[in-house]
């Protein structure tokens, strides 16, 4: 990680993640989202978060709702968001950790909608999971004392507060999903960072130790 006193612009350039393998994963994710949209409305109806359908046993919707989109415009907005957050946070965790973060975030969002937002009858889209990624990234940047940690946390907190205080169009955006996603991502990211820190402390005397990414 660059020193905190280094040139902020140089640090930001280094913070962007351009590892080829990770961008191949991103491309695969984008293509998968495109494929789901191309399957049509009948498939989307089977995959989306639908409160009555989940109550009837459609538990898979708790996960699949996050890969379904309303239309091409909705999909492209979320794919753009995915590219941006991936550029900032891709290298903060290894592939297994990212799987844990994304899956736990998807479940946390759907569970939050189920238990805490009963008025939400249906939901689709990746935006909640994007906030999970942002929350996890903020947790890791905070753990390693990255120069941009307070900027990222402040921007995310301000966005969530703005949405929760009514600065959105409630008919179009389920902002509770953003809140649940960000909280779950931050918590899981903090736990993963704490785990690595503990392992590093315990193995310090034994030789090379795991390091927090960034």
What are these regions (language model features)?
Residues 1-20, 163-214:
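C-terminal transmembrane module of polytopic alpha-helical membrane proteins
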Residues 25-110, 114-123, 173:
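N-terminal TM1-TM2 helical hairpin plus the immediately adjacent luminal interfacial "cap"
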Residues 16-19, 51-57, 144:
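Helix-boundary and loop/linker segments of multi-pass membrane transporters
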Residues 47, 119-126, 144-153, 169-176, ...:
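A cytosolic-side transmembrane-helix exit/cap motif
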Residues 90-98, 140-150:
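Membrane-helix interface "capping/anchor" motifs
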Residues 35, 87, 110-115, 137-138, ...:
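Alpha-helical transmembrane segments of multipass membrane proteins
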Residues 75-82, 124-135, 173-193:
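Alpha-helical transmembrane segments that form the membrane-embedded catalytic/substrate-binding core
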Residues 29-30, 104-106, 148-159:
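Central hydrophobic cores of alpha-helical transmembrane segments
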């Amino acid at each position: 990680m660059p020193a905190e006193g280094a040139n902020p612009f140089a640090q930001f350039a280094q913070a962007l993640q351009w590892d080829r393998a990770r961008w191949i994963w991103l491309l695969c994710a984008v293509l998968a989202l495109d494929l789901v949209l191309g399957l049509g409305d009948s498939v989307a109806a089977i995959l989306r978060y639908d409160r009555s359908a989940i109550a009837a046993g459609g538990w898979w919707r708790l996960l699949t709702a996050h890969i379904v989109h309303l239309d091409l415009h909705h999909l492209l907005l979320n794919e753009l968001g995915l590219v941006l957050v991936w550029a900032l946070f891709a290298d903060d965790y290894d592939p297994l950790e990212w799987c844990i973060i994304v899956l736990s975030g998807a479940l946390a969002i759907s569970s939050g909608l189920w238990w805490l937002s009963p008025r939400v009858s249906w939901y689709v889209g990746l935006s909640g999971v994007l906030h999970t990624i942002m929350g996890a990234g903020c947790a890791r940047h905070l753990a390693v004392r990255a120069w941009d940690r307070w900027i990222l946390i402040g921007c995310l907190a301000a966005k969530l507060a703005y949405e929760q205080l009514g600065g959105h169009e409630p008919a179009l955006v389920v902002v509770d999903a953003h809140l649940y996603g960000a909280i779950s991502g931050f918590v899981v990211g903090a736990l993963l960072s704490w785990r690595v820190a503990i392992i590093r402390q315990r193995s310090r005397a034994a030789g090379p130790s795991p390091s927090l990414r960034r």
